[in-house]
Amino acid sequence: MSTILICGHRAYAARGLKSVLEKQGHTVLEFSRGEMKREGNTVTGPVVEIDKNPLFKEDVDVVINFILLQNGSVEENENYIMALLQFCERHSVKRLVQISSISSYPNDAPLIKEDTPIDKHVELKGGYGIIKTAADNLLEKKKDAEPFDIVFVRPGYIVASDNPHPFKGIAKFFGSKLAVLIGDKKATLPCIHRDMFHQCLAEIAIQDMPLCVYLLVEKNNSTKYSYFRSQSRAVVIPLPRRVFFLAADIAKALHVFKERHVCMVKGAFKVNRFDNSLTRNKLKALK
C-alpha cells in the first residue's frame, strides 16, 4: 500500500477522498493552508512554503494536489507549484496527480480528448481558468525534467449534494423562484459525481503506466440547462447567444471590451463535445 498526501484536503472536491483511500489500505496525509501545525496525519502551514515545512517527516509515494490560490495572482500560484515540485523531490514522491480542469482547454475546441492541447492563450481566460491553465502550462514545461510522474486529471463539473455553490458560474438567481442561465440551452456542462471522481482518483494514484491526462466526464454530454433543471425547480431564462455575441463585438469595437472580455462572454456559451475513450478504457470506475 502507498502513502498518499492530499494537498487541499478541505476543498469541496476533496471531501471524502481520505476515507476512500484509507478503505483501500493506504496511509493518507493531509495538507492545507494554516498555522504551522501537525495533528496526527494532518499538516498545516504556509502553502507556498510546503517544501520547507519541517512537520513532514516521512517520504510520500503519491501527492494529489487540489490546491488553487483563488484569490492569488498567477505568479503566486506558480510559486506554489514550484514549491510543490521541490517538496516532491525532497520526499521521494513517485507520482504527482494534478487536479486540473476542463477549463484549461480552448473555448472553441469542437472536440476535446485526452490529447487535446490546453489553451496557450492564458491571458484570455477568466480568473479561475487563468490560474488553472497557468499551473498546467508550468507543470507541462517541468514534467520531463522531474524524477517522478506528473499526471493531469481534468474533471467536468463536480456534482455532490453538499456543494456550497451549486450554481456558481451557471446561473444567477433573482429571489428563490427565478434565475437567469449564464449561457443558452446549448451551452455544454460536462459533469461527474464526486463519489465516482474519488473512485477514479484511487485508481489513478497507483495505476501502472498511467495516462498523461485523464478526462473525467460522465457519458451524457450534459448542458448548463439540463444541470440546472436537475438541481432546481425555479424558472430559468437562458440568455440569447447572438445578442450577447453582437454586444461583445460592438463593445470591443468601441474599446469598452478587450479581447479577454469578449472571450469570457463567448465562453459562457461554448459548446464542446468530449471523447474520453482512453480514460474509460483505463479506469474500472467509469465502466
Which residues does each PLM region occupy?
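N-terminal Rossmann NAD(P)H-binding glycine-rich loop of SDR-like oxidoreductase domains
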Residues: 4-24
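Glycine-rich Rossmann NAD(P)(H)-binding loop
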Residues: 7-8, 160, 182-187, 214-222, ...
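NAD(P)H-binding glycine-rich loop region in Rossmannoid oxidoreductase-like domains
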Residues: 44-83, 87-90, 105
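Conserved Rossmann-fold NAD(P)-dependent oxidoreductase catalytic core, especially the SDR/UDP-sugar
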Residues: 83-127
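Catalytic helix-loop patch of NAD(P)-dependent Rossmann-fold dehydrogenases
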Residues: 110-153, 157-158, 179
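Substrate-positioning beta->alpha
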Residues: 163-169, 181-205, 211-212
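Mid/C-terminal beta-alpha module of Rossmann-like enzyme folds, strongest
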Residues: 200-260
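C-terminal amphipathic/interface module of NAD(P)-dependent oxidoreductases
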Residues: 222, 234-238, 259-287
